[in-house]
Amino acid sequence: MDYIQIGRVTVSRFILGSNPFSGFSHQSPDVDLLMRRYYTAAKIKEVIRAAERVGVNTLVARTDFHIMRLLLEYRDEGGGIQWFAQTCPEVGDHETCVERATMYGATACHIHGGVMDHLLAQRRLDEIPPVVERIRERGMLAGIAGHNPKVFEWAEQNLDVDYYMCSYYNSASRDERAEHVSGMEEWFRDGDRRIMTDLIQGLSRPVIHYKVMAAGRNNPEEAFAYVATVMRSGDAVCVGIYIKENPGMLEQDIRLLERGLLGCDGG
């Protein structure tokens, strides 16, 4: 496993995502429910342990009660994965989410991508600098996520953060509400992927690439080969896995990423 530095923190280049753990399939309400039924607390902890065994040291997950309780149990049982906390608009405001991240031992905290998209549309991005300052005051790395490239164009001019989380797909309208709603209309366009990855090349902060699989729609070999061509040396990729039908998905995804990166390095 390769590692990068984000601020003072060493981060595995493959980061474990948690949308499947929380039942966010971005496919349909039926698949959301299947994920929730499959991913019991015990099963989630099993997957995180497996990730740690192969060198993954970072989990991106929400500041909701389900995740926080699970991480508390996981650590009490000896787990050591570091938590990059994502704010959670449907269960609390910015300040509440930052305090939860602090209380439950997050290493970093970033603003939810849907929130950033929404605030951009509502012309309210001036709310964000004080939140970043609060995150830093609590001793965590600070970041933002987003699906709309314009979020990062704004951030480059107006925000001092430690990292960005850039979605390859601007897959839904967040103009009227920030949170994801199960069953909402979503789209995954190749053109959006290219626009975001072109933008990433000029960004001044480390980037965690996410939604690289288009929520399971992309062929894994193509997806990770593409990721390898656009990841910079200080970037990482965040991938959620749903292993019900493919128990070896974690190892497969890591292998595909490492093979792609090796090819890009001329190995």
Regions found by a protein language model. Name each.
Residues 25-42, 83-93, 118-121, 213-219:
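Active-site mouth loops of central-metabolism enzymes
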Residues 112-115, 163-173, 230-246:
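Glycine-rich phosphate-binding active-site loops on the catalytic face of alpha/beta enzymes
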